[in-house]
Swiss-Prot record:
Keywords: Amidation, Amphibian defense peptide, Antibiotic, Antimicrobial, Cleavage on pair of basic residues, Cytolysis, Fungicide, Hemolysis, Secreted, Signal. Expressed by the skin glands. Belongs to the frog skin active peptide (FSAP) family. Temporin subfamily. It is found in: Secreted. It comes from Sylvirana spinulosa (Fine-spined frog). It comes from the Eukaryota. This is Temporin-SN4. Residues 1-22 form the signal peptide. Transmembrane segments: none annotated. InterPro entries: Frog_antimicrobial_propeptide. Residues 23-44 form a propeptide.
Amino acid sequence: MFTLKKTLLLLFFLGTINLSLCEEERNAEEERRDGDDEMDVEVKKRFITGLISGLMKALGK
């Protein structure tokens, strides 16, 4: 009975560690995806401001 409890306890802890590692990996992937989205927004903002300034120069001439 005692060895069964030790085995079950060991399996529980190993499962918990495995689950926490999976959560960390998933969080890291989400952070990478979020970072890419922020970069896309910055590029779009730069493009729009460049486009507007180019139009203003063309209309001002």
